[in-house]
Swiss-Prot record:
Belongs to the krueppel C2H2-type zinc-finger protein family. Transmembrane segments: none annotated. The gene is ZNF707. SMART domains: KRAB, ZnF_C2H2. It comes from Homo sapiens. GO terms for biological process: regulation of transcription by RNA polymerase II. It is found in: Nucleus. Residues 71-143 are annotated as: Disordered. This is Zinc finger protein 707. A zinc finger (C2H2-type) spans 176-198, 204-226, 232-254, 260-282, 288-310, 316-338, 344-366. It holds the Pfam family KRAB. The lineage of its organism: Eukaryota, Metazoa, Chordata, Craniata, Vertebrata. The keyword DNA-binding applies. One of its GO terms (molecular function) is DNA-binding transcription factor activity.
Length: 371
């Protein structure tokens, strides 16, 4: 029987997409698909092969998403019903598309079909100028592909890079790198926000109490303390708290014996020396002067730390590499370098880096012939 002379329905010439395939299409391709499918339905109806309006056409006319489940697709239902009367049976009882590896390869065909928007209009529009209605079958996804980059079923082929990988790649391309620590950021605003960690800038101030914060999210979290209900009240001073454990922590101020109280702000101290050091904050007095540069300091400890700048003393020495530091903070940061794994290793000289920005900057020295 000549297949070209069979009565053709819209179901024979329609294209059906699954949810995953529909998500791969561009908006322009979706609009093209809608126009082509509605034109094909009009052509079928105009030639007298009219049938009840398909659900796919109704969805397209109402601008709804036309994807269907796999069990609703014609090729799936054809397998469930068996071959049509008079159709040729395959010599191989097991279809190759039923193999798991073949089903895996079909994902490549779907992606290629989604990228070729013109294939909709070229392969699936019905031509009725000569009065004949050809059977325009959609491109079969179970047709044997020519080549695939992956041959192993367990391989994670075609995996799109994750959000973190794309962000790092974009940071390297745009060179949003912190000059202090070498960390790479995805945009200029993130770089500016990150640099406040090094500068100590706190640009967000609470209008209620004046407390400053480095991040806007911390300010918003803090402002809830002013608006939320505070049912736990201190019997000694009347200060209220939103949490019971905060009240218990506050009560220690009243129970601990602090005989030395500041006359300016009321803050109490256990030792008189601590009170005298605190009062310098109110008076602004700096009694300790550097003999080399004349700079004044509030405490003797701060003066001794400053004098290391002139003497060159570096009392903090790393036991791993022997590097010395003047300040304990810099020494503690350096020790983390030995404890933290260095993820980025240079293939030319073997030098390791913790941050992608420093690693990228180092590789440029090899390209420019500086190393």
């Amino acid at each position: 029987m000549d297949m070209a002379q069979e009565p053709v329905t819209f179901r024979d010439v329609a294209i059906y997409f699954s949810r995953e395939e529909w998500a791969c299409l561009e908006p322009s391709q979706r609009a093209l698909y809608r126009d082509v499918m509605l034109d094909n339905f009009s052509s079928v109806a105009a030639l007298g092969f009219c049938s009840p309006r398909p659900d796919l056409v109704s969805r397209l006319e109402q601008w709804e998403e036309p994807w269907v489940e796999d069990r609703e697709r014609p090729e799936f239902q054809a397998v469930q019903r068996g071959p049509r009367p008079g159709a040729r049976k395959s010599a191989d009882p097991k279809r190759p598309c039923d193999h798991p590896a073949w089903a895996h390869k079909k994902t490549h065909v779907r992606r290629e079909r989604a990228r070729e928007g013109s294939s909709f209009r070229k392969g699936f529009r019905l031509d009725t100028d000569d009065g004949q209605l050809p059977r325009a079958a959609p491109e079969r996804t179970d047709a044997k592909p020519t080549a695939f980059p992956c041959q192993v079923l367990t391989q994670r082929c075609g995996r799109r890079p994750g959000r973190r990988e794309r962000r790092k790649q974009r940071a390297v391309e745009l060179s949003f790198i912190c000059g202090t620590c070498g960390k790479a950021l995805s945009c200029h605003s993130r770089l500016l926000a990150h640099q406040t960690v090094h500068t100590g800038t706190k640009a967000f101030e609470c209008p209620e109490c004046g407390q400053t914060f480095r991040w806007a999210s911390n300010l918003q979290r803090h402002q809830k303390n002013h608006t939320r209900e505070k049912p736990f009240c201190c019997e000694a001073c009347g200060q209220a708290f939103s949490l019971k454990d905060r009240l218990a922590q506050h009560r220690k101020v009243h129970t601990e014996h602090r005989p030395y109280s500041c006359g300016d702000c009321g803050k109490a101290f256990k030792q008189k020396s601590n009170l005298l050091r605190h009062q310098l904050v109110h008076t602004g007095e700096r009694p300790f002067y550097c003999a080399d540069c004349g700079k004044a300091f509030r405490t003797k400890e701060n003066l001794s730390h400053h004098q290391r700048v002139h003497s060159g003393e570096k009392p903090y020495t790393c036991a791993e590499c022997g590097k010395s530091f003047r300040w304990p903070k810099g020494f503690s940061i350096h020790r983390r370098l030995h404890l933290t794994k260095r993820f980025y290793e240079c293939g030319h000289c073997g030098k390791g880096f913790r941050h992608l920005g420093f690693f990228t900057r180092h590789q440029r020295t090899h390209r420019h012939g500086e190393v």
